[in-house]
């Protein structure tokens, strides 16, 4: 009994000692600040956009409607937050504020009647498949000058050169690049960067950096005033190369070499946040000057490539945020292409935003023999209970030749990150070839699906048997840009032959009407 009593006495003494040594409230450490997203209840009504036939007028309507609501409803809340010491950044694409505050302040804001909810904005690490599929691939790939007359087999597979031969190379189309940045002075990219006119450069309205708090050691730092790729493997430079790359001397990794490239860095060495992704979508909808002011939706992108994912487990805890953003961008007539992800060969492995959304065009990866890449994520989408079909289609994504910083090329860029820019570039080709289609996202998506080369699989996933088209492995099939042009052509039917080295030619009859 004495032993227990002694222990109680010691505990009481120790507790008293700790109480005497505890800091006073005045010397207590300040509350830990975190990044939060404050979503307001009132959101813009964009239902009138679909009835506006003119592409630029529709975009202006969307931009004005979004900003009218944000300007009217955010001001009182911003004033109060800043008065309390919170750091605040305003967003308009979704009526939302980004704030840095402690938990108590966040809880207080969440109770306000005009606030719908407060969500986390913690960093999200982007999933990338390694370049090497096996130990021999990396050494076979590497970095080197691209051969003087190189056009990759991947471009032959989607039949881009035949579209170029018809005079359609993406001219007049603006391609938006949301990624780790890009090395704008790379010889395959510099001629196609909209900020370079052949002699002088202006990054205003052509480049934006959404990374304002880069981690130590980031080679681009924060708020880079010029396009810079902070990924050690040059991820953004590689995806940009597949979009538009062409050095004018024969090295041409790009699908749409005459398209204009603008860009926004939305990741800090592969780590993004919902707010960074939002900010880049905003810039690509309505680019700003070098100070981030005076937005101009008339200078925005036609198509936005997104070779990244934002997993729920790593930051995208509120799926409605990015979905609403993608929906609003789409309402403005901008085509949004996303990678399916690299989660492997099981069914229902497309699990991350934005690939899971019905309104985002999701792309899986094939190799050069039209076999599905083992890493390419499959559908259907089960994480939201919809069981919807994804991917929409597939494109080459294994051992793709493209650009890497500062001025070299790789022959081994691999992943659905490589597949998505094939489709983004194809949209640029189609919209340069078919001006009435430009800005018509619904009809363009339908055209791409109907004209894809149908591919079958032995893998059944949910309600989608692999021996039917569409299926949850290949979607509607593999991208073919010539097919898309022919399927659009309203002239009498023409027989379409889709040759491929790995199998007999597949014959399809193109319909009379798109």
Model-derived features with residue positions:
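Hydrophobic h-region of N-terminal signal peptides that target proteins for export
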Residues: 8-18
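Protease zymogen maturation seam
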Residues: 111-174, 187-190, 374, 379
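Inhibitory N-terminal propeptides of secreted protease zymogens
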Residues: 21-136
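Catalytic-core segments of hydrolase enzymes
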Residues: 239, 281, 293, 297-403, ...
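Structural recognition of the beta-strand scaffold that forms the well-ordered cores
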Residues: 36-39, 89-90, 96-100, 117-119, ...
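C-terminal subdomain of the subtilisin-like protease fold in secreted/lumenal serine endopeptidases
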Residues: 87, 152, 294-305, 360, ...
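Subtilisin-like serine protease catalytic core
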Residues: 30-33, 50, 117, 151, ...
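Hydrolase catalytic cores
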Residues: 240-243, 262-270, 332, 397-469
């Amino acid at each position: 009994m004495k032993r227990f009593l002694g222990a109680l006495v010691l505990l009481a003494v120790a507790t008293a000692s700790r109480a005497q040594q505890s800091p006073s409230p005045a010397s207590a450490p300040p509350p830990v600040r975190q990044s939060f997203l404050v979503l307001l209840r009132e959101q813009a009504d964009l239902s009138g956009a679909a009835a506006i036939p003119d592409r630029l007028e529709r975009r202006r309507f969307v931009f004005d409607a979004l900003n009218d609501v944000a300007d009217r409803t955010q001001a009182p809340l911003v004033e109060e937050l800043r008065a309390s010491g919170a750091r605040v950044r305003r967003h308009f694409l979704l009526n939302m504020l980004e704030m840095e505050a402690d938990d108590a302040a966040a809880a207080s804001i969440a109770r306000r009647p005009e606030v719908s909810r407060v969500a986390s904005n913690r960093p999200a690490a982007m999933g990338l498949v390694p370049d090497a599929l096996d130990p021999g691939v990396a050494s076979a790939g590497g970095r080197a000058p691209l051969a003087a007359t190189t056009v990759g087999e991947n471009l032959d597979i989607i039949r881009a050169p035949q579209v170029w031969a018809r005079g359609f190379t993406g001219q007049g189309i603006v391609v938006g690049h949301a990624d780790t940045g890009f090395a704008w002075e790379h010889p395959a990219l510099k001629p196609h960067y909209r900020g370079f006119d052949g002699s002088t450069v202006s990054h205003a309205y052509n480049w934006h950096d959404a990374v304002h708090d880069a981690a130590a050691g980031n080679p681009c730092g924060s708020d880079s005033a010029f396009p810079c790729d902070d990924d050690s493997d040059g991820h953004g430079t590689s995806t940009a190369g597949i979009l538009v790359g062409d050095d004018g001397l024969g090295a041409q990794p790009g699908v749409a070499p005459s398209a204009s490239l603008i860009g926004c860095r939305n990741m800090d060495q592969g780590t993004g946040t919902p707010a960074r992704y939002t900010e880049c979508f905003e810039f690509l909808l309505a680019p700003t000057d070098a100070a981030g002011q005076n937005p101009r939706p008339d200078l925005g992108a036609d198509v936005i490539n997104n070779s990244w994912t934002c997993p729920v487990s790593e930051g995208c805890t509120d799926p409605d945020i990015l979905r609403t953003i993608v929906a609003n961008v789409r309402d403005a007539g901008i085509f949004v292409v996303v990678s399916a992800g690299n989660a492997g060969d099981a069914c229902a492995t497309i699990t991350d935003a934005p690939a899971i959304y019905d309104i985002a065009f999701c792309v899986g990866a094939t190799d050069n023999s039209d076999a599905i890449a083992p890493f390419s994520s499959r559908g259907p989408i089960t994480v939201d209970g919809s069981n919807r079909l994804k991917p929409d289609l597939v494109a080459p994504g294994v051992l793709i030749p493209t650009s890497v910083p500062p001025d070299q090329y790789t022959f081994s860029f691999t992943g659905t990150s490589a597949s998505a820019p094939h489709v983004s570039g194809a949209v640029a080709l189609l919209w340069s070839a078919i001006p009435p289609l430009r800005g018509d996202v619904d009809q363009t998506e339908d055209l791409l699906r109907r004209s894809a080369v149908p591919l079958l699989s032995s893998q059944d996933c949910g309600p989608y048997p692999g021996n039917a088209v569409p299926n949850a492995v290949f979607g509607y099939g593999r991208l073919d840009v010539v097919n898309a042009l022919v399927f659009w052509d309203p002239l009498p039917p023409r027989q379409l032959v889709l040759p491929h080295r790995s199998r007999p030619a597949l014959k399809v009859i193109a319909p009379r009407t798109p």
